[in-house]
Amino acid sequence: METLETEKFFSDDKPLLKPISDHSEIKTKARRNAVVSVLIQPFQWLQMLSSRLNLSFVLGVVLVYGVNQGFSGSIFKVVTDYYWKDVQQVQPSVVQLYMGLYYIPWVMRPIWGLFTDVFPIKGYKRKPYFVVSGVLGLVSAIAIVVLGKLPAALALSCLLGVSAAMAIADVVIDACIATNSINIRSLAPDIQSLCMVCSSAGALVGYATSGVFVHQLGPQGALGVLAFSPATIVILGFFIYEKRSSTVPTQKTKKDTDGLGVAVKGMCKTVKYPEVWKPSLYMFISLALNISTHEGHFYWYTDPTAGPAFSQEFVGIIYAVGALASMFGVLIYHKKLKGYSFRNILFFAQLLYVFSGMLDLVFIKRWNLTLGIPDSLFVITEESFTKMISKIRWIPMVVLSTRLCPLGIEGTFFAFLMCIDSFGQLASKWGGGFVLHAFGVTRHDFGNLWLVILIRNILRLVTVCFVFLVPDSDHLDDLVPSDVLPKKQSEDDDDDDIKLLLL
């Protein structure tokens, strides 16, 4: 009897083990599904953007921001640093001044914006400017490689041509970005996230390969890689679809003149609104007060006596890791921060930016070695944190800029706001060059570099005092009155959506 009861007891227990096993399988399957969900989320996000904005617009952003700005821009930064240092043998403070000149074509973005908005060529407003941009960049990049060692002024002119090509292509695609951000305002943060992801991904590839290019081809030969991006922009200009204007030739001049007048009046009227000029002023202050010490850092990085003497390949790796961290910054903003007000995000991001600047000071003073942290580990950690915070700090300002653009002159006005950004960066480069020169930082003397960095960090802290200029609103709020432009619009306005011609 007892044996039968025991057998029954154990036989009754056996089914109890099965649900536990099933539960374990369910948990394993859930974890697997979660991993798959995370992996396919970016593709679902791209599909959503393509369906709501159209695939051609997304591809246009990938080409201009990913290849033109990200990849080519990162190659430009690293290779030109070595070019001025090793080929032209220029002092770091002078290179800072040259780098400021690179921003002149970007300062001229309102002019490029006016051309794309009101001066179509052969009935097209976008296609011809892509071609012009690509040809200019292609010729400039090839010239600086083929002509050998050029005088500094001529070499600077070629590099300015490459920079101008990037700026023109950027303006053309930004006009479309501003239009879509206005028409579908809920997607404005997503569009900027797409831009930043493409830019960071392209920069990651560019930085990762830049050191190898410099090592294998030399600083001057590596500049030839800059011809790749404008070549793709030329092809894009020929194969992109755009609806041709139906305006007859006899009416063209009058239409262009009227359009120019409307654009200028709209800009003047818009910029007078406090909701517009206050955040624009903050954007300039936050960039201008953040004086650049990049060339001082770069010369110190690669100096075998005073600095850690990083190799060309490792310098590229540092920047590549920074680009990867930028992508994490975009992800953090997109997932966690885009619902907060512009003012709150910028306030806390600026405070973290001050802290990241103090890490530079620790590295220059070599306190990291006292703490037992190797130079390579510390610089990669510092670069990652700085780039991530920089991106979180920058995206809200760009999103805010798109919300300040009145419909009808969005290309021109967005270019105007980005021109303010370029002025700020130019002031940052020249201000940093002046301070480096004033404190006697040269190719081989870095004794006062830590003082320059300390001054820069203090100025970053001062910037926090101006955050009140930023509106305490989010990306869904109306910032610009709807009556900025006259209501009369041309009936045959071109469709600004970029559509790739499917072959």
UniProtKB/Swiss-Prot annotation:
A cellular component annotation (GO) from this entry: membrane
InterPro entries membership: BT1, FBT, MFS_trans_sf
Primary location recorded for the protein, binned into one broad class: membrane
Pfam families: BT1
Compartments (UniProt record): Membrane
Entry keyword set: Membrane, Transmembrane, Transmembrane helix, Transport
Segments traversing the membrane: 56-76, 101-121, 128-148, 153-173, 194-214, 221-241, 281-301, 314-334, 344-364, 369-389, 404-424, 450-470
Free-text function comment from the UniProt entry: Could mediate folate transport.
Family: Belongs to the major facilitator superfamily. Folate-biopterin transporter (TC 2.A.71) family.
PANTHER family reported in the protein's UniProt record: FOLATE-BIOPTERIN TRANSPORTER 1, CHLOROPLASTIC, FOLATE-BIOPTERIN TRANSPORTER 6-RELATED
Protein name (record): Probable folate-biopterin transporter 6
Organism (species): Arabidopsis thaliana
